[in-house]
């Protein structure tokens, strides 16, 4: 986590849904991934995502400018009409950032079979995006892991 920056923008409406999705996966621009982060009651609308940690040395204002430029490419001018912008630069947080001796590969151990097994006669189950063999490290991986874990629990409680 220490190598990323978490960002969030709030809006008056979920205009991105008109363009099909609030989900972004990109290899171009500062935002590699972003999600619709609106509440279930549909009273709060936001986009939440991550920036590459290399942007930690760029000013908050410049990061926001780059984010809005990328969002405008996806969603149009409405992306610049945000209500609030928040960010956490994990690199600056003492308890979540550790200097690395070398380049950190993304999601290097995620999806390993050891994370998909149950332990203690099926009573100890690991769950989370890191355990998913598909899309591990991403929201889709978390959803798949949750479904897999639910299936394991159903099977466990049948007995």
Located regions from the model:
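Conserved flavin/dinucleotide-binding core of flavoenzymes
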Residues: 19-159
